[in-house]
Structures are given as C-alpha cells and as structure tokens.
Amino acid sequence: AGSGIEGADGLCASLAQAAGLGGAWVAWVSTSSVDAISRLAADGRWTLIDGATEVFPSRGDVQFGPLHAIDTAENGEVVSDLGDVFVWTNTDRFGKNVTAGQANACDDWSGQTGTADVGVVVDPQAAMGLSWTDTGQPRACGSEFRLYCFES
C-alpha cells in the first residue's frame, strides 16, 4: 500500500474494495503539511458503512465529535471493546495536525521511529467522547493500530 499519507489512503481503498464498497476513500490522518479535515469533502455527510447510521452530518460537525461510535469495520464487523481500540490519527478534534510546528508523526507516516497521537473507538456519549481522534497520549510508531477511513 506504500507509505506516508498515500499509503494510508491506499490501505483504506484496498480494504473498501475487498469489502465491495464503492467510491474513493481517504484515511483520517494528518501530516506536517496536510490536515485531515482538508481531505474531506466540504459538502459531505458521513455514516457507518450501513449508509444509515449517521456519524457526522457535515464536515463542520467533526469538531463536536461523532453522533455514533465509529465502531464498524469495512466488512461490517462491530468493534465491541470500546475504549480499548486505538486508531492512528495525529489529528485534533478540529481535524488539524496535533504536532504542528514539531517533529511530526512517525516521519509523516513513513517511519517506525518516534510517536504519533492516536484516537480511540469510544461511545460518543461517554465522558471521553471527543477522544475519538485525539487521546493526548502518543503511541510508539511501530505499533499496529486501526485507521478511520472516510469516503471522499
């Protein structure tokens, strides 16, 4: 799938294709030069893969957190251990790079050294609902975590 943000997008695209999902897909990750929010369509509305369960009514609503946990994989599998599943993002609740002005996440997603910020799959009604994209607890770049993929 390659490396960097293109590699993350490629992984999202290949997983979506394997699951029979159409469209183009991007990973919800930020780099030193690209904020995740800028990669989403301005007029978007995002749901879980069922097409009915609304997560974000619009791009502007991302800052308020998801209406429903982003708890469904591309194959329909529901993540049941909410609060224990980490997701690579390096992105704050406004969709901006968490480490702006600093050494960036895992060499802009091309390396395995250093750390990057993660989100966590959570119930949006929980006290930690906004940590879906930013826990404030960076993790080692060599770790294997999930990605949030948005249809673009």
Model regions and ranges:
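Secreted/extracellular ectodomain signature
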Residues: 1-152
